Regions:
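A short acidic, Gly/Pro-enriched loop at the edge of an enzyme's catalytic core
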Residues: 86-98
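A short SAM/SAH-binding and catalytic strip from SAM-dependent methyltransferases
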Residues: 97-109
Length: 195
Protein backbone atom coordinates (compact mmCIF):
# COMPACT_ATOMS: atom_id res chain seq x y z
CA UNK A 1 0.00 0.00 0.00
CA UNK A 2 1.31 3.40 -0.99
CA UNK A 3 -0.26 6.81 -0.96
CA UNK A 4 -1.85 9.21 1.49
CA UNK A 5 -2.42 6.52 4.11
CA UNK A 6 1.35 6.20 4.42
CA UNK A 7 1.48 9.86 5.54
CA UNK A 8 -0.82 9.70 8.59
CA UNK A 9 -0.75 13.42 9.45
CA UNK A 10 -1.79 14.37 5.89
CA UNK A 11 -4.40 11.61 5.73
CA UNK A 12 -5.74 12.82 9.09
CA UNK A 13 -6.00 16.41 7.85
CA UNK A 14 -7.90 15.31 4.73
CA UNK A 15 -10.28 13.22 6.83
CA UNK A 16 -10.94 16.22 9.08
CA UNK A 17 -11.78 18.32 6.03
CA UNK A 18 -14.12 15.63 4.65
CA UNK A 19 -15.89 15.37 8.01
CA UNK A 20 -16.48 19.12 8.10
CA UNK A 21 -17.82 19.12 4.54
CA UNK A 22 -20.47 16.45 5.03
CA UNK A 23 -18.95 13.10 5.99
CA UNK A 24 -19.23 13.67 9.76
CA UNK A 25 -22.95 12.83 10.18
CA UNK A 26 -22.53 9.68 8.08
CA UNK A 27 -19.65 8.46 10.26
CA UNK A 28 -21.63 9.20 13.44
CA UNK A 29 -24.58 7.23 12.06
CA UNK A 30 -22.25 4.34 11.26
CA UNK A 31 -20.93 4.28 14.84
CA UNK A 32 -24.43 4.67 16.33
CA UNK A 33 -25.39 1.28 14.89
CA UNK A 34 -22.53 -0.57 16.60
CA UNK A 35 -23.39 -2.93 19.44
CA UNK A 36 -21.42 -5.10 21.86
CA UNK A 37 -17.95 -6.19 20.85
CA UNK A 38 -17.12 -4.14 17.74
CA UNK A 39 -14.24 -4.33 15.29
CA UNK A 40 -13.46 -0.98 13.68
CA UNK A 41 -11.87 -2.38 10.53
CA UNK A 42 -9.50 0.12 8.94
CA UNK A 43 -9.68 2.51 11.88
CA UNK A 44 -6.89 4.62 10.40
CA UNK A 45 -5.83 7.44 12.70
CA UNK A 46 -8.71 6.71 15.07
CA UNK A 47 -11.10 9.52 14.16
CA UNK A 48 -14.10 7.18 14.43
CA UNK A 49 -13.07 5.43 17.65
CA UNK A 50 -14.32 8.29 19.84
CA UNK A 51 -17.78 8.13 18.24
CA UNK A 52 -18.83 4.82 19.80
CA UNK A 53 -21.26 4.62 22.69
CA UNK A 54 -19.40 3.85 25.96
CA UNK A 55 -21.20 0.48 26.14
CA UNK A 56 -19.53 -0.62 22.88
CA UNK A 57 -16.32 -2.60 23.38
CA UNK A 58 -14.35 -1.46 20.34
CA UNK A 59 -11.12 -2.82 18.89
CA UNK A 60 -9.37 -0.81 16.18
CA UNK A 61 -7.54 -2.53 13.33
CA UNK A 62 -5.45 -0.99 10.57
CA UNK A 63 -2.61 -2.22 8.34
CA UNK A 64 -0.60 1.02 8.70
CA UNK A 65 1.37 1.16 11.95
CA UNK A 66 1.90 4.94 11.72
CA UNK A 67 -1.86 5.46 11.63
CA UNK A 68 -2.26 3.37 14.77
CA UNK A 69 0.30 5.56 16.55
CA UNK A 70 -1.99 8.54 15.90
CA UNK A 71 -5.07 6.48 16.82
CA UNK A 72 -3.51 5.67 20.20
CA UNK A 73 -3.51 9.40 21.04
CA UNK A 74 -7.26 9.59 20.36
CA UNK A 75 -8.35 6.35 21.98
CA UNK A 76 -6.02 5.43 24.82
CA UNK A 77 -8.21 2.63 26.17
CA UNK A 78 -9.17 1.02 22.87
CA UNK A 79 -7.10 -2.04 21.92
CA UNK A 80 -5.39 -1.49 18.56
CA UNK A 81 -4.17 -4.19 16.18
CA UNK A 82 -1.92 -3.84 13.12
CA UNK A 83 -3.22 -6.31 10.52
CA UNK A 84 -4.96 -6.49 7.15
CA UNK A 85 -8.62 -7.14 6.40
CA UNK A 86 -7.68 -10.28 4.46
CA UNK A 87 -6.09 -11.95 7.51
CA UNK A 88 -7.95 -10.94 10.67
CA UNK A 89 -6.12 -12.22 13.78
CA UNK A 90 -9.28 -13.18 15.69
CA UNK A 91 -11.21 -16.36 16.42
CA UNK A 92 -14.41 -17.07 14.50
CA UNK A 93 -17.65 -15.56 15.74
CA UNK A 94 -16.24 -13.10 18.29
CA UNK A 95 -17.73 -9.78 17.11
CA UNK A 96 -21.27 -8.44 17.35
CA UNK A 97 -20.49 -5.66 14.87
CA UNK A 98 -17.83 -4.93 12.28
CA UNK A 99 -17.66 -1.29 11.20
CA UNK A 100 -15.88 -0.23 8.02
CA UNK A 101 -15.67 3.37 6.83
CA UNK A 102 -14.20 4.02 3.37
CA UNK A 103 -12.03 0.91 3.65
CA UNK A 104 -13.09 -1.75 1.15
CA UNK A 105 -12.38 0.51 -1.81
CA UNK A 106 -8.70 0.03 -0.85
CA UNK A 107 -8.56 -3.59 0.32
CA UNK A 108 -6.55 -5.42 -2.37
CA UNK A 109 -8.70 -8.58 -2.18
CA UNK A 110 -12.13 -7.32 -1.09
CA UNK A 111 -13.77 -10.75 -1.43
CA UNK A 112 -11.21 -12.33 0.88
CA UNK A 113 -11.52 -9.44 3.35
CA UNK A 114 -15.30 -9.81 3.44
CA UNK A 115 -14.95 -13.58 3.94
CA UNK A 116 -12.80 -12.77 6.97
CA UNK A 117 -15.42 -10.31 8.25
CA UNK A 118 -18.09 -12.99 7.90
CA UNK A 119 -15.87 -15.46 9.76
CA UNK A 120 -15.29 -13.19 12.79
CA UNK A 121 -18.92 -12.01 13.04
CA UNK A 122 -21.36 -13.85 15.28
CA UNK A 123 -24.26 -15.47 13.38
CA UNK A 124 -26.56 -12.61 14.48
CA UNK A 125 -23.85 -9.96 14.00
CA UNK A 126 -23.92 -6.99 11.64
CA UNK A 127 -21.53 -5.47 9.16
CA UNK A 128 -21.94 -1.69 8.98
CA UNK A 129 -20.26 -0.01 6.03
CA UNK A 130 -19.80 3.45 4.62
CA UNK A 131 -18.32 3.27 1.13
CA UNK A 132 -18.10 5.23 -2.05
CA UNK A 133 -19.14 2.97 -4.91
CA UNK A 134 -19.33 2.76 -8.67
CA UNK A 135 -21.79 5.36 -9.90
CA UNK A 136 -25.12 4.32 -11.38
CA UNK A 137 -24.81 7.21 -13.80
CA UNK A 138 -23.20 5.98 -17.00
CA UNK A 139 -21.06 9.08 -17.62
CA UNK A 140 -19.81 9.15 -14.04
CA UNK A 141 -19.01 5.43 -14.03
CA UNK A 142 -17.03 5.93 -17.25
CA UNK A 143 -15.14 8.77 -15.57
CA UNK A 144 -14.41 6.56 -12.54
CA UNK A 145 -13.05 3.87 -14.87
CA UNK A 146 -10.88 6.44 -16.62
CA UNK A 147 -9.30 7.92 -13.48
CA UNK A 148 -9.04 4.64 -11.58
CA UNK A 149 -5.41 3.75 -12.51
CA UNK A 150 -4.06 7.19 -11.55
CA UNK A 151 -6.28 7.58 -8.49
CA UNK A 152 -5.41 4.10 -7.22
CA UNK A 153 -1.70 4.93 -7.37
CA UNK A 154 -2.01 8.31 -5.66
CA UNK A 155 -4.52 7.31 -3.01
CA UNK A 156 -2.89 4.17 -1.67
CA UNK A 157 -5.01 1.63 -3.50
CA UNK A 158 -8.48 3.20 -3.53
CA UNK A 159 -10.56 2.02 -6.46
CA UNK A 160 -13.38 4.51 -7.06
CA UNK A 161 -15.21 2.18 -9.44
CA UNK A 162 -15.73 -0.85 -7.18
CA UNK A 163 -19.20 -2.37 -7.00
CA UNK A 164 -18.94 -2.85 -3.25
CA UNK A 165 -22.59 -3.69 -2.54
CA UNK A 166 -22.49 -6.51 -5.09
CA UNK A 167 -19.21 -7.78 -3.60
CA UNK A 168 -20.76 -7.78 -0.12
CA UNK A 169 -23.73 -9.83 -1.35
CA UNK A 170 -21.46 -12.28 -3.20
CA UNK A 171 -19.47 -12.74 0.03
CA UNK A 172 -22.58 -14.13 1.72
CA UNK A 173 -24.25 -11.11 3.29
CA UNK A 174 -27.79 -9.81 2.97
CA UNK A 175 -27.97 -6.01 2.86
CA UNK A 176 -30.78 -4.99 5.21
CA UNK A 177 -30.81 -1.23 4.95
CA UNK A 178 -28.96 1.46 3.09
CA UNK A 179 -28.83 5.19 2.62
CA UNK A 180 -27.54 6.82 -0.53
CA UNK A 181 -25.93 10.12 -1.25
CA UNK A 182 -26.00 10.18 -5.01
CA UNK A 183 -23.82 13.22 -5.67
CA UNK A 184 -20.88 11.54 -3.93
CA UNK A 185 -21.90 7.96 -4.74
CA UNK A 186 -21.72 7.14 -1.04
CA UNK A 187 -23.57 4.24 0.56
CA UNK A 188 -24.17 3.64 4.25
CA UNK A 189 -25.55 0.19 4.87
CA UNK A 190 -26.00 -2.63 7.31
CA UNK A 191 -25.67 -6.27 6.30
CA UNK A 192 -26.12 -9.56 8.10
CA UNK A 193 -24.18 -12.75 7.38
CA UNK A 194 -26.11 -15.53 5.68
CA UNK A 195 -25.38 -18.93 7.21
Amino acid sequence: MRGLEQIPWLYDALCALMERTGLGPWRRSLADGARGRTLDLGCGTGRGLALYDPAVRAIGLDPVFGSLVRARRRARRVPLVCASAEALPFRAGVFDTVVSSLVFCSVPDAARGLAEVKRVLRPDGRLRMLEHVRSQRRWKAAFQDRVQPLWTGVSGGCRPNRETERTVERAGFAIESHERRAQADLRLFSARPLR
